[in-house]
Amino acid sequence: MPLTLTLTEGVLPKGQEKVAFSRLSDAMLKWHGLAGNKALTPNIVGSIHVLPKEHTYSGAKEASVAFVEWKVPSFAFASRDVQVGYIEEATSIIHELSGAHHPKERIWVNVVHAVDGAWGIAGMAFTNAQLGEGAASA
């Protein structure tokens, strides 16, 4: 389940991007009751993008920003409690790691759901049911 963390250069002190990625990933698993799950944990993957300020925008103007975006099966983030809790925690993680300098108003968190049956791992297309079975049996 890919996490894409996009930050304007300087939002986090150099080196804290990796810490943020790890904490955001751990929080996602925690909010879904899957911390330490042997099937899903290795499939938390992703990338960190640190961009110069002239390449990030808010209100159509250059601005320092943070974007936390997950691509997940449609059963993830389905509960309102999980949505609210994770978004609050993810925002706090970025804000805290910025030394409380980056405003929460410029931290965006969103989730994109994959089409059922189009979740590909190792060349195999899995359905939500298959993913759920794998997670439950781990």
Task: Report residues per predicted region.
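A domain-level signal for the structural core that forms small-molecule/cofactor-binding pockets
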Residues: M1-A138
